[in-house]
């Protein structure tokens, strides 16, 4: 099931989220933003996202530069729907 994966410009380009993803949803791409790495995470294969949120857990920034937004079917099955 596909989930929405958002990467914010607070990404420091550390690659922790890319390495943590079990389904290779993420990859690093060149970026001319404000990080020393010159790279930022990108999510070109969100259709493979299983919603495990390992990428969020691996993110070392205080801002959670990467967020996975679970679809309604997943939140319902987890008992999280309102």
Curated annotation (Swiss-Prot):
Keyword Oxidoreductase: yes
UniProt remark on cofactor binding: Binds 2 [4Fe-4S] clusters. Cluster 2 is most probably the spectroscopically characterized electron acceptor FA and cluster 1 is most probably FB.
BP-aspect Gene Ontology terms: photosynthetic electron transport in photosystem I
Catalytic activity: reduced [plastocyanin] + hnu + oxidized [2Fe-2S]-[ferredoxin] = oxidized [plastocyanin] + reduced [2Fe-2S]-[ferredoxin]
Intrachain S-S bonds: none
GO molecular function: 4 iron, 4 sulfur cluster binding; electron transfer activity; metal ion binding; oxidoreductase activity
Pfam families reported for this sequence: Fer4_7 (PF12838)
Subunit organization: The cyanobacterial PSI reaction center is composed of one copy each of PsaA,B,C,D,E,F,I,J,K,L,M and X, and forms trimeric complexes.
Protein name per its UniProtKB record: Photosystem I iron-sulfur center
Organism of derivation: Synechococcus sp. (strain JA-3-3Ab)
Record gene name: psaC
